[in-house]
A protein has these predicted regions:
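Active-site mouth loops of central-metabolism enzymes
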Residues: 1-16, 37-43
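Active-site groove signature of glycoside hydrolases
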Residues: 23-42
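Beta/alpha (TIM)-barrel catalytic core signal, keyed to glycine-rich beta->alpha loops juxtaposed to Asp/Glu
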Residues: 43-167
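Flexible loop residues that form catalytic
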Residues: 20, 36-39, 69, 97
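Short, basic/glycine-rich phosphate-binding loops at helix/coil junctions
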Residues: 1-2, 30, 141-145
Length: 167
């Protein structure tokens, strides 16, 4: 939501700025669920959780979540929150569809173990499961297929096999 290419990451500075900007744009005094999208290798998880906890204690955020976190990072976040007295993640938002099921082996059991809800994203696999992409037909020149042509190229053998499964 920013023109600043450096306005990213999970540091206190950017999280607080993002929440304040969202509250202003939404014209509200709190966010029900604030999710951290993807781990940030440049920011210590304790720093991220500390910033998020402060926002919860200030009443600006009600609940915290993670998105696209691997199981081991979810565990680390839960342990860090418990050890340091931070608010913990309550939900995880992983990619999940008939074709993307990797979370079943580790992320889902981890969420169950730690009592996290799961809010899957991309259940239609980025439009792939809609029947929009067909062998012998070029994908649309705009949108997701244009940004990630290797993923949606119906002539690639792996993609074509998947498309054959879609009615």
């Amino acid at each position: 939501m920013s023109e600043d290419p450096n306005a990213q990451g999970n540091s206190r500075r950017w999280i607080v700025r993002a929440v304040e900007d969202s509250l202003r744009r939404l014209g509200t005094d709190h966010i029900d669920l604030y999710q951290v999208h993807r781990p940030d290798a440049n920011t210590d998880l304790d720093d991220t959780l500390s910033a998020l906890s402060d926002l919860v204690h200030q009443g600006k955020v009600r609940y915290l979540g993670s998105s696209t976190f691997p199981a081991e990072t979810i565990v680390e976040a839960q342990w860090t929150a418990e050890r340091r007295g931070h608010e913990r993640f309550r939900v995880e938002q992983p990619p999940y569809s008939l074709f993307v099921r990797g979370i079943e082996a580790s992320v889902l059991p981890t969420c169950e173990r730690y009592g996290l809800g799961v809010i899957p994203w991309s259940p239609l696999n980025g439009g792939f499961l809609t029947g929009r992409y067909r062998p012998g037909e070029a994908p649309p020149a705009t949108g997701r297929a244009a940004r990630m042509p290797q993923r949606f190229d119906p002539e690639r053998p792996g993609v074509a096999r998947k498309l054959d499964l879609i009615p």
